[in-house]
Design a protein with these regions (language model features):
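Bacterial Sec-dependent N-terminal signal peptides
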Residues: 1-25
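Surface-exposed binding patches on compact interaction domains or structured appendages
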Residues: 22-82, 102-188
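Contiguous beta-strand segments within globular domains
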Residues: 83-106, 186, 265, 280
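Well-ordered beta-strand positions in beta-sheet-rich domains
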Residues: 85, 175, 216-220
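Hydrophobic residues positioned within well-ordered beta-strands of beta-sheet architectures
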Residues: 98, 111-113, 186-188, 203, ...
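Short, surface-exposed loop/turn segments at beta-strand-coil junctions that are enriched for proline
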Residues: 105-107, 191-198
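Aromatic-lined carbohydrate-binding surfaces of glycoside hydrolases
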Residues: 160-161, 170, 191, 201-209, ...
Length: 341
């Protein structure tokens, strides 16, 4: 453990409440699914309907590489030049990304994807487990900064138009049905192994409908001789707050139970792999007066004795810190106490 920092803040900006699905949206629209869907979920209806004129010429399924810089609309034809090959470059230990786009004029009942073998001319191979992919899913949002006055503060929802945007990368969903006149991006990542032999590797992303091949997309990855250290060795000071309370509520498990820690482990491992350095700990009940959908409680039990002295139980604090260290987040602990208002 490198450092312990205690915060007693007098002012703190809230990032706003994070509202979980509860069978209805924040605005009261039914979602048509359980309050806390696991593994997969239904997306909300798109307020923007497909254009009959725009889609009239699309009578089959189209597949192309896109760009990672664009969030492709769900029901608008993607504005791209069809591309069957994309080339990426990276150091050993670096993660490189690409985005493929599927759009179809006919229904696909079982859209899925897989990776072929990636080899260089000398027969060296990038292992299968270096590659991950996921369908890019869509969530509802509204206009950002419409009045030019920033996004914070009270705002009437009726004054801001709603739209569906591509946002989460769903690595749990392995296959999906795709209605006609719909766009579906696929996000691809290669975490180049530290042990990879420098060279240019060629392979394929296979887009299928069930067992029927729709398209082979060529992917070329050039591996440099340079090496990026492991995430826990990075100097970059990444501090994304964790909320164990939100995880317990969403997965409907008792707080600080073994089921709770089991639910948190894959989430916190992803955070560790991103280079997270800080463990978020709270020492008092609602240290900033709630604000978030799942308020932060104390990880230390405060007990005032009959004689006026205080005793403190650090059991939960210790379990939380030890758990976070076990997934690889072990540089600092930021402890938040009371925020006076």
């Amino acid at each position: 453990m490198k450092r312990l920092t205690i915060f007693s803040l007098t002012c703190l900006f809230s990032m706003g409440a994070v509202f979980a699905q509860r069978g209805v949206t924040q605005c009261g629209v039914p979602t048509g699914q359980p309050k806390f869907p696991l593994l997969t979920y239904q997306e909300l209806p798109d307020p923007t309907a497909p254009s009959d004129k725009e889609w009239a010429a699309v009578t089959s399924t189209q597949v192309s590489w896109g760009t990672t810089d664009v969030r492709y609309a769900k029901h608008q034809l993607p504005q791209l030049k069809k591309q069957q090959t994309v080339s990426l470059k990276g150091w050993r230990g670096e993660r490189v990304n690409a985005q493929a786009v599927v759009w179809t004029g006919v229904e696909l009942k079982d859209l899925n994807f897989s990776f072929g073998d990636f080899k260089d001319k000398k027969g060296n191979v990038l292992p299968k487990d270096a590659f991950t992919g996921g369908f890019v899913r869509y969530v509802m949002t509204d206009e950002l900064n419409k009045d030019g006055r920033g996004a914070c503060g009270h705002r009437k929802s009726i004054d801001y138009d709603s739209l569906l945007v591509a946002d989460p990368i769903d690595t749990n969903l392995k296959t999906m049905a795709l209605p006609a006149r719909t766009v579906q991006p696929v996000w691809v990542q290669c975490w180049i192994p530290q042990s990879a032999t420098p060279g240019t590797y060629q392979g394929e992303l296979l887009i299928n409908d069930g067992s029927r091949l729709l398209q082979r997309l060529n992917l070329e990855i050039t591996v440099s001789s340079r090496e990026l250290p492991q995430p826990w060795e990075w100097a970059y000071h990444l501090d994304l707050w964790q909320s164990p309370y939100a995880v317990a509520r969403y997965y409907q498990v008792p707080l600080w139970s073994q089921e709770h820690f089991d639910a948190m482990r894959p989430l916190m491992k992803m955070l560790a792999d991103a280079g997270q350095k800080i463990i978020t700990a709270t020492l008092t009940h609602k240290p900033w007066n709630g604000q978030t959908e799942d308020y932060f409680d104390t990880m230390v039990t405060w007990m005032k004795r009959a004689d006026g002295t205080w005793a403190f139980d650090y059991t939960i604090f210790d379990r939380w810190v030890e758990f976070m260290m076990s997934v690889g987040i072990d540089k600092h602990i930021n402890c938040y106490s009371m925020v006076p208002w």
